[in-house]
Amino acid sequence: VDATALRRGVLDAMRGVVEFDAFVWLLTDPVTTVGVAPFAQVPCLPELPRLIKAKYGTGLNRWTTLMGAGSPVGLLRDTVGGALIRSRVWREVMSRHAVGDVASTVFADRFGCWGFLDLWRDDRRGPFSRADAEFLTQVAPSVATALRLCQSRAFVEVATPHRQEHGPVALTLDDDLRILSRTSASKAWLERLLPPVPSEQAVPASVYNVAAQLLAAESGVDDHPASARVHLADGFWLTVRAARLSEEPTRHPEPEPEVVRTAEVGGTAEVGGTAEVGGTAELVRTAEVVRTAEVVRTAELGGGPASHREPPRPGLSGGVPADTVPSIDVPADRPSVGPTLVVTIEETSAAERLELFARTFGLTPREDELLGLLAVGGDTRAIARQMMVSELTVQDHLKSIFGKTGAHDRVTVLSRALGTRRGLASAERRPADGDRA
């Protein structure tokens, strides 16, 4: 069962217990927590960029917030005390579609975050109940494990090459997640990620998600990296990243140093009309003296010109008291001006694949360490020395890895983890060195 079929089946089972009218379910990169591969049925697909930006731009029932909470489930109406206007997502998108409540669930385990689900309920049905939340809380751990195992199946076969020969894949977006430009090579890649509707260009949600995560990081909502690894097909993984293009500062030529002419008059040097007497030079210009005097006088009088005074700050004396500011989920976005966002798509690196492989199969830290040493060509003796364990312990770790991954030897493990058989010749030459368990 792939991840989409799994999610469809889980939702069908949920409908018998929890009533909902729409849903959004994303897989996530287990480390960065950024969403990929959405499975959704919502009434606002044309507003997808706005919805994604709002979802990432608030900590209110955010999946990363729920990961650190006592429960993996959050009910929107309960969280805001019935005042839905406090929710940014509701104000900017859901309010126009008669959404009355949202049940948010994160699916995470000790190996990472594997997805999050938002169930929407029409305002005519009434809010979600505590019983609904308890049910979702009970099933969340099992669903998290199932999602993780689904991701692990993407490593069963050696990756089929999908490299494009048309150059780098990059898109630029503004802060409202509108596509501004794209490289010519992006079309083929994006259509593989998300086949487009006829007459429309394909823009997978992963592009919007990494861009929205960058905006969230810039505004201080969440500090995870703006990147995500997504499975394309046949064991092939792509990494999607977002960054902000920086503007080069305008450089002005340094002013030429002032040439000071001096004239020796009876052993005295004149500098700008000031005489140096007894080795002491007075170089204070009249304008500087006047300016200094004005600054001192202003400080003594307790203020400056009205145009230079700092306006009162909210919550400080003379301003608006802090406790009068309404408690509302206010967006902290930067304005949609200035440098644009750039999103790149590239083949996932070997190191990133190894990390993902270890997490999806639930390897222990020591098994993960051993896998990394195998990847750089270590044999059993060298690995035992580096891990400071016996060779027998290395063999035990290998047996555990083989059992979890379904592989029968280290060559198969590495070929699946790295997505290629290249570079494994050294491992293939050591069949007797603890290669099989």
Give the predicted meaning of each segment.
Residues 210-263, 293-296, 300, 313-349:
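PAS-family sensory/regulatory modules and their coupling/dimerization elements
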Residues 366-370:
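The N-cap/first-turn positions of alpha helices
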Residues 410-421:
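Short, basic, alpha-helical segments at the C-terminal edge of helix-turn-helix-like DNA-binding modules
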